[in-house]
Amino acid sequence: MKTPKIGFSLLLFMGLSFTMLHAQNEVSQREVIALLELKAKTKGHLWTNQWDQSQPISTWHGVTIKNGKVVGLDLSNNNLQGRIPITIGNLRHLEVLDLSGNNIEGKVPGLFRKFEKLKVVNLADNALAGNIPTAIHKLQNLEELNLSNNRLEGELPLGISELSKLRTLALANNDLKGPIPMGMEKMKKLKMLYLANNKFSDFDALRKLSKQQLVMTDVMVKEGNLIPLDFTKSPEGLSRLEFEKQE
């Protein structure tokens, strides 16, 4: 007689029940569920730095708690494998989300409308595919967005120019295409821009950005594309502008 398999839901319930005994009212049950499902969906047993569920959540690697809310999640370079579960949207008080340097697959979570307090999103150096969610403009407090070194495709969402507090935008080494959205000049605080090694076809939207005091601009333009004239007139701030031969 075969031993019946224990379903994922039961395992999660068992883990949740055990963890809640030790949570000491640190965070809400909703947030505990989100953390445990992230662990389960990304092979937590293989993580470089694992979570000891017998210990308070505030001691878990990469988890930052403030006033009873999870405000920071930094699991960078921690051997996460798999996909980001939709329940991560339960961490609505997150200010920092850093899952860079792992092997996370699937799409960028389209849950940005729930993360109103996010200031930093770093999902670089993974295997994420698909488009950048159109709801990204909901992150009105975002200061850093790093999606470099993935497999993202499609065009940049038009609303990305509405991220008025953004200081760093890093999208290099993907398969993004089409024009850079107009209105980038509204991003008054943008200091670091990385767009190299994509398939962008029109850089005219960067014309007014070149007048800002950009500390670092990394743009690779394919041969045959037009360069905004202001780049040649006001090269200060441009640290890298290269030409790549059309394949």
Give the residues covered by each predicted segment.
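Conserved positional slot within leucine-rich repeat
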Residues: 74, 98, 122, 146, ...
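Consensus "Asn ladder" position of solenoid repeat domains
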Residues: 78, 102, 126, 147-150, ...
